[in-house]
Regions:
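Conserved C-terminal structural/oligomerization subdomain of aldehyde/semialdehyde dehydrogenase
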Residues: 67, 164-244
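Short helix-initiation/N-cap motifs at beta->coil->alpha
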Residues: 18-21, 62, 194-196
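Short, well-ordered alpha-helical microsegments
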Residues: 22-23, 42-43, 222
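PLP-dependent aminotransferase-like
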Residues: 1-20
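Structural motif
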Residues: 15-17, 36, 215
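Short glycine-enriched loop/turn motifs at secondary-structure junctions
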Residues: 26-27, 60-61, 92-94, 127-128, ...
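Short SAM/SAH-binding signature in class I
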Residues: 31-32, 211
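ALDH superfamily catalytic-core signature
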Residues: 32, 38-174, 197, 236
Length: 244
């Protein structure tokens, strides 16, 4: 509605498709390209744009961390993490990709996360008509393979017919496959740390994230994370509201 009110006919168009259609579009000589998506495809876009000397803006995703230290308000953190992560079933570029939490508060955090998932999405999210599905079968299959009996903490139910995967918490390490890609789904790995410096080192061992979130009552820890990590945007004691 906004587009139809704002622009004349012919000024805006939509092309639906996959690799073939995108490849064709990138062969055109545009004045400007704004791209939102994965780093891998962003590299392709930039290379093709360079052939026409077309300027670009690349808003690329990444593994956006959510740090929870021992001083955090755990119930508040859980409420806001569940909202930010599972909005649109995790299919947003600024969703918390994984949790890095102090090992001393992990059990309490998990307990609160489980409670919030039930409160926000019901005891059976797959049957909740307001809970979204995966965008397609390919993404459904990609998410489903990360869930195993060995790493499952909570959730894990999937429904192939509806392409729904319920909000899922996983025990994880940085060596796991789920930590090697941007998740873009309702899978939330949880990794622990001993101190904030270790958490910062782990974040900086990965590519720079699009977003970063920290839940902490310690100004020292907040400043350490914000000053020593590079990221696109983020929040203290909240998630995703920086894009509002």
């Amino acid at each position: 509605k906004l587009i139809s009110k704002t622009f004349d006919k012919g000024h805006v168009d939509t092309v639906l498709g996959g690799v073939e259609e995108c490849t064709f579009l990138l062969d055109q000589d545009f004045d400007y390209i704004f791209y939102t998506g994965s780093t891998r495809v962003g590299e392709i876009v930039m290379k093709k744009a360079a052939e026409h000397f077309t300027p670009v803006t690349l808003e690329m995703g990444g593994k956006s961390p959510c740090v929870v230290d021992e001083t955090a308000n755990i119930s508040l953190a859980a409420k806001r993490i569940v909202f930010g992560k599972f909005l649109n079933a995790g299919q947003t570029c600024v969703a918390p990709d994984y949790i890095l939490c102090d090992k001393k508060i992990k059990d309490k955090l998990v307990e609160e996360l489980e409670r919030q998932i039930v409160l926000q999405y019901s005891v059976d999210p797959i049957k909740n008509a307001a809970y979204p599905k995966m965008i397609n079968k390919k993404q459904f299959d990609a998410m489903s393979k990360f869930i195993t009996d060995e790493n499952l903490i909570f959730g894990g139910k999937i429904d192939e017919e509806s392409l729904k995967i319920e909000p899922t918490l996983l025990n994880s390490t940085f060596a796991d496959d789920v930590m090697k890609i941007e998740i873009f789904g309702p899978i939330l790995p949880i990794i622990t740390f001993d101190d904030i410096d270790e958490a910062i080192a782990k974040i900086n061992s990965l590519t720079k994230p699009l977003a970063l979130y920290i839940f902490s009552s310690s100004k020292t820890n907040q400043n350490k994370v914000l000053n020593r990590c590079q990221f696109g945007g983020g929040c203290i004691n909240d998630t995703i509201i920086h894009i509002a």
